[in-house]
């Protein structure tokens, strides 16, 4: 029998060593024990996979940019090599996302009770995020499918958060931040993105007195990010004469 506490300890250790693949593997094992995760365990899982997928997303963006430049040069051999390397990174990224999505569907979301609103929103947001990461690299019909799955998860999380969580709750704010990025970057819908971000920011400002001391730092940081995005997006729209964002 695997010792749960040992696995969690290993994940903490791996995080300190910045060995995020090891951290993710340990937290995957914890999740597969099929018992609800504590808040700390939930955060360890999230941080681990965010770093694992983040490295691939970053590599993919760099290689995609090189691929565009190489295509302009017309060097066939180099174009083929760059394309093959991009596809290799894509496969890795997709495997990480599918790993997380299967943990969410088979254990984490499934095991949330009706009243565990915070966990449910946390995991549905995560589901929206990982389908969004798939959408960043997908094309055609495949892209349409993952975009729809991302929208569905974000939308469900958004409804639950509005009904059951304070506007200043960091998980509710973090969801609004990522959902608005989804509208802006994936759906190419800057107006919806701005509306969602502005509403979340304004609702939180109106209830600043409900800010929990423990989450004060987290909440205010996310509010700042919402405001930064709004500033950027509205200036983009003005630059484009009210057109679409350039991401």
Curated annotation (Swiss-Prot):
Site (Interaction with phosphoserine on interacting protein): 57, 132
Protein name: 14-3-3 protein gamma
Matching InterPro entries: 14-3-3, 14-3-3_CS, 14-3-3_dom_sf, 14-3-3_domain
Region (Interaction with SPATA18/MIEAP): 2-247
Modification N-acetylvaline, positions: 2
Protein function: Adapter protein implicated in the regulation of a large spectrum of both general and specialized signaling pathways. Binds to a large number of partners, usually by recognition of a phosphoserine or phosphothreonine motif. Binding generally results in the modulation of the activity of the binding partner. Promotes inactivation of WDR24 component of the GATOR2 complex by binding to phosphorylated WDR24. Participates in the positive regulation of NMDA glutamate receptor activity by promoting the L-glutamate secretion through interaction with BEST1.
PANTHER family: 14-3-3 PROTEIN (PTHR18860)
Quaternary structure note: Homodimer. Part of a complex that contains DSG3, PKP1, YAP1 and YWHAG; the complex is required for localization of DSG3 and YAP1 to the cell membrane in keratinocytes. Interacts with SAMSN1. Interacts with RAF1, SSH1 and CRTC2/TORC2. Interacts with ABL1 (phosphorylated form); the interaction retains it in the cytoplasm. Interacts with GAB2. Interacts with MDM4 (phosphorylated); negatively regulates MDM4 activity toward TP53. Interacts with PKA-phosphorylated AANAT and SIRT2. Interacts with the 'Thr-369' phosphorylated form of DAPK2. Interacts with PI4KB, TBC1D22A and TBC1D22B.
């Amino acid at each position: 029998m695997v010792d749960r506490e040992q696995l969690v300890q290993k994940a903490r250790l791996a995080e300190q060593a910045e060995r995020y693949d090891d951290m993710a593997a340990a937290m995957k094992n914890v999740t597969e024990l099929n018992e609800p995760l504590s808040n700390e365990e939930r955060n360890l899982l999230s941080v681990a996979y965010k770093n694992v997928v983040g490295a691939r997303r970053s590599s993919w963006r760099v290689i995609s940019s090189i691929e565009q430049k190489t295509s302009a040069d017309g060097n066939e051999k180099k174009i083929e090599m760059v394309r093959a390397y991009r596809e290799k990174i894509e496969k890795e990224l997709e495997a990480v996302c599918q790993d997380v999505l299967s943990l969410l569907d088979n254990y984490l979301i499934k095991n949330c009770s009706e009243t565990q609103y915070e966990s449910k929103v946390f995991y549905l947001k995560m589901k929206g995020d990982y389908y969004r990461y798939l959408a960043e690299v997908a094309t055609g019909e495949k892209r349409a499918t993952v975009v729809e799955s991302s929208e569905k998860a974000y939308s469900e999380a958004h409804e639950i958060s509005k009904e059951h969580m304070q506007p200043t709750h960091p998980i509710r704010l973090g969801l609004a931040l990522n959902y608005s990025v989804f509208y802006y970057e994936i759906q190419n819908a800057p107006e919806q993105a701005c509306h969602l971000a502005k509403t979340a920011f304004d609702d939180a400002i109106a209830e600043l007195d409900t800010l929990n001391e423990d989450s004060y730092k987290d909440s205010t940081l996310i509010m700042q990010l919402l405001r930064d995005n709004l500033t950027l997006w509205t200036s983009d729209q003005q630059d484009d004469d009210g057109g679409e964002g350039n991401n």
